[in-house]
């Protein structure tokens, strides 16, 4: 999943230096950047780390001339990360009228993508739990974007959020939270109650109408932009599943 961008204030160069474990990949990146740079007004000397996530993907920010102050580069080694779902879902979101990073260039062989930059400020950065009414316009925007996304849904386009996937994700709760975080053995009555509850959840979800599901639709993945709709990130794991999933 995509980590939040680094803070709005520019970090020191040492904090954003790009390190490469593979010199050949580093050379391929430099060659690719030099090749696409002129068409997009990129300034290669300004490339720096923007964020990383729990996968093998990394994101760099690079300055550009003209109206685009900066662009984002995704580094997704193809032997570790498949970029095709990201490209597909970015296109689906654009078709639905949802603001997501536009894929400007894609080196499929090496897994390098040039994206437009939706900024540094997430919705999580600006909402104030102590003043819920002040955050209502942002939540309204988020719901509007979600509705547009759902209304564009078509079966057979995205992978199904089927029983196997639901059960796999539910199993994370007893394993990681109850077992590892709380140190409680999942057995006896606890196990029976969980299994009974999980069966109800699975059946309820499978009986719901199916739409496009982002799967990580939350404030840290929504970008606040002055005078524009919220931008949506971290959508590459989207599926076709229960209509209630994202809004929950």
Annotate each PLM feature.
Residues 60-166, 172, 178-182, 206-207:
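ATP-binding pocket architecture of kinase catalytic cores
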Residues 29, 36-38, 154-160, 164-165, ...:
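An alpha-helical support segment within catalytic cores of ATP-dependent transferases
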Residues 42-60:
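ATP-binding glycine-rich phosphate-binding loop
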Residues 220-222:
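Catalytic-loop signature of eukaryotic-like protein kinases
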Residues 216:
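Conserved catalytic-loop position in the HRD/HxD motif
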Residues 2-42:
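Juxta-kinase regulatory segment immediately upstream of eukaryotic protein kinase catalytic domains
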Residues 210-212, 224-248:
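Active-site Asp-x-Gly
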């Amino acid at each position: 999943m995509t980590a939040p961008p680094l803070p709005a204030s520019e970090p020191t160069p040492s904090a954003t230096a790009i390190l490469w474990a593979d010199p050949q990949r580093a050379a391929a990146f430099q060659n690719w950047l030099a090749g696409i740079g002129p068409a997009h007004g990129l300034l290669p000397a300004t490339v720096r780390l923007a964020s990383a996530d729990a996968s093998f993907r990394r994101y760099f920010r690079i300055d550009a001339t003209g109206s685009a102050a900066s662009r984002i580069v995704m580094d997704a080694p193809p032997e570790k990360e498949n970029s095709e779902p990201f490209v597909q879902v970015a296109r689906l979101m654009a078709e639905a009228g949802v603001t997501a990073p536009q894929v400007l260039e894609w080196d499929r062989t090496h897994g390098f993508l040039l994206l437009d930059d939706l900024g540094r400020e997430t919705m999580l950065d600006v909402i104030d739990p102590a003043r819920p009414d002040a955050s209502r316009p942002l939540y309204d925007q988020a719901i509007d974007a979600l509705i547009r996304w759902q209304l564009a849904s078509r079966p057979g386009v995205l992978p199904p959020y089927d029983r196997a996937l639901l059960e796999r994700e539910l199993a994370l709760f007893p394993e990681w939270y109850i077992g590892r975080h709380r140190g409680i053995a999942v057995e006896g009555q606890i196990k029976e109650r969980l299994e009974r509850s999980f069966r109800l959840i699975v059946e309820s979800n499978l009986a719901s109408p199916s739409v496009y599901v982002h799967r990580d639709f939350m404030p840290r993945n929504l970008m606040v932009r002055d005078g524009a709709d919220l931008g949506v990130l971290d959508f590459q794991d989207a599926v076709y599943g229960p209509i209630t999933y994202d809004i929950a």
